[in-house]
Design a protein with these regions (language model features):
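Peripheral terminal appendages
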Residues: 1, 5-6, 34-53, 121-124, ...
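ATP-dependent adenylation/nucleotidyltransferase module used to activate substrates
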Residues: 1-186
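Residue-level signal for mature regions of secreted extracellular proteins and peptides
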Residues: 99, 197-200, 288
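Secreted/luminal cysteine- and crosslink-motif detector
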Residues: 107, 158, 205-208, 270, ...
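A short, structural micro-pattern
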Residues: 126, 198-201, 223
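Immediate flanking context of iron-sulfur cluster ligation sites
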Residues: 188-201
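Local cysteine-cluster metal-coordination motifs and their immediate loop/turn environment
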Residues: 200-212
Length: 298
């Protein structure tokens, strides 16, 4: 978009806040504010969406309806939709690494559905044409390699009464990782703190697709939250990893040696304090996690 010289007021950034506004449970503390400051650095408005109560409330649901979806509105207020109809049911288990989104419910309930709800339930998007850009790449998984580069989005209603024309475009589906880092370097972007500590992709801190070294690293960064996860595994009788409990899995891994106290502090703070675009006197460097361990969505 920057290369095409498109006016910044015609595009907006959206971010699905996995943990919502109540507490940090599964995601990096710094991620929402990093996204906020990233958007500001490029002069782009950003709107956040989340499920009320976030990951934790959805996981702890017991004979209850799923919570409403929440989304920021242009006037600064919060819109809410859903959570009032359907059949009460129970989760009390972590999402599992699977292609089926009913099993991998963190993707469907906390990302995909929340994004769609923010579009479908705002009348300002009626009688408009919307293009959603998303950054999936084919190198990330065999499943993502099959994604269409261009297709109608699930929020599309171009033939309905609201005439809401919504397409999804995946402009970097066929990019290599080298191409991604090249454009990041060109615009002198300081990436999310997790990359500098050794992560090869920025997802949740405790992403269910994480490998043994990532979970060992996450444990070194947030030991209290790992203990809570371990206790919940025992309570549920269901583990994040299919073959063993989380503490056993962590013991098989090695924390990344690029984790420093300084980066730990930045990554676990709710406020991001560094410039997103590097100042002229600071040299851009490839982060430790670049071209590292590949473990992501199936």
């Amino acid at each position: 978009l920057l290369a095409s010289s498109a006016a910044s007021d015609v595009y907006k950034r959206q971010h699905q806040d996995i943990d919502g506004r109540e507490r940090n449970f599964f995601d990096w503390e710094v991620t929402p504010d990093y996204c906020r400051r990233f958007a500001h650095a490029f002069g782009v408005k950003i709107y956040f969406q989340w499920k009320e109560g976030g990951f934790y409330r959805e996981m702890m649901r017991e004979n209850r309806l799923t919570a409403p979806n929440c989304y920021e509105l242009p006037d600064g207020t919060i819109g809410r939709s859903g959570g009032t109809r359907g059949k009460p049911n129970t989760r009390l288990r972590f999402p599992q690494a699977a292609a089926d989104l009913r099993t991998r419910w963190c993707s469907s309930y906390l990302k995909i559905d929340v994004c769609s709800a923010a579009i479908v339930n705002q009348s300002r998007f009626n009688n408009t044409r919307i293009l959603i850009l998303s950054g999936e790449r084919g190198e990330e998984s065999p499943q993502r390699a099959k994604y269409a580069i261009w297709e109608p989005d699930r929020a599309d209603c171009r033939t309905g009464k609201h005439h809401r024309h919504v397409d999804r475009h995946r402009p970097i589906r066929d990019w290599t990782e080298a191409q991604v880092w090249e454009i990041i370097k060109r615009y002198r972007i300081r990436v999310h703190p997790c990359y500098y500590m050794g992560w090869s992709r920025c997802s949740c801190l405790f992403c269910i697709f994480g490998n043994k070294n990532q979970f060992a690293s996450a444990s070194a960064i947030s030991p209290e939250r790992i203990q809570e996860i371990a206790q919940l595994e025992q309570q549920f009788g269901c583990t994040i990893k299919r073959k063993c409990d989380i503490m056993s899995f962590i013991r098989t891994g090695t924390p990344y040696h690029h984790i420093t106290e300084a980066w730990k502090t930045i990554a676990t703070c709710r406020l991001y304090i560094l410039p997103v675009i590097l100042p002229d006197d600071e040299q851009w460097e490839l982060p430790a996690g670049a071209f590292g361990e590949q473990c992501g969505p199936v």
